[in-house]
């Protein structure tokens, strides 16, 4: 009797791992790619190529949520968070060459902001999606991604670029001082701190991808459901 229960438990565990593995791999790939592509600037520095890969993390979360429920989606989120922390630790040890000085590829405040924003925004996405899952097929992924993306942008830019955050050292605050340089808003408007333009551009890309991602969500969610059933 006990042996049968153990065997059944192991079988369920193996099945759950098989279900989660594609989501974990996809999330890890997105996080790693985004951490690499964030080093490459475009549009006069308003965006990086990472801005176009990172939002697809919400697609992965929503697909896992639709197919296997919020508990499985949260496990994928935590896996992505761990991968992100590892990437940040590696990035903090890579020194880049500036004009007569060296600096870490990933500043401390940016690393902390990235991790917190990812974890909170993704978990909020999971909760909103689950609450709205019984409506029209597009409502849950669209609403959860829009709200999660807005929260992600708000948290990241607040923690990363607020002029001074008490629990960070003076050196950590100085590392992001460039974000307060006055620049034309979005390169053509009135002068504003650079981080404001970065935040607006980042948010705009996320909103666009939230709409675009409805297409692969529809297609992939149906395929996954066919496999599950």
Predicted segments, located by residue:
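Transmembrane alpha-helical segments of multi-pass membrane transport proteins and ion-pumping complexes
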Residues: 27, 31, 35-36, 58, ...
């Amino acid at each position: 009797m006990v042996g049968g229960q153990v065997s059944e438990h192991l079988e369920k565990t193996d099945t759950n791992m098989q279900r989660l593995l594609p989501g974990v791999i996809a999330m890890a790939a997105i996080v790693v790619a985004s951490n690499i592509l964030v080093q490459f600037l475009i549009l006069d520095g308003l965006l990086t190529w990472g801005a176009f890969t990172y939002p697809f993390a919400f697609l992965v979360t929503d697909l896992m949520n639709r197919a296997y429920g919020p508990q499985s989606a949260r496990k994928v989120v935590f896996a992505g968070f761990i991968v992100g922390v590892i990437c940040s630790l590696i990035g903090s040890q890579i020194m880049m060459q500036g004009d007569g000085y060296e600096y870490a590829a990933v500043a401390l405040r940016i690393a902390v902001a990235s991790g917190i924003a990812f974890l909170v925004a993704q978990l909020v996405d999971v909760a909103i999606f689950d609450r709205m899952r019984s409506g029209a097929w597009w409502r849950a992924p669209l609403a959860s991604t829009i709200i999660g993306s807005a929260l992600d942008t708000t948290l990241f830019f607040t923690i990363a670029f607020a002029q001074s955050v008490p629990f960070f050292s003076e050196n950590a605050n100085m590392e992001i001082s460039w974000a307060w340089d006055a620049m034309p808003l979005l390169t053509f408007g009135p002068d504003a701190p650079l981080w404001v333009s970065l935040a607006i551009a980042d948010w705009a890309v996320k909103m666009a991808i939230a709409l675009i991602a409805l297409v692969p969500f529809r297609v992939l969610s149906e395929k996954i459901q066919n496999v599950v059933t």
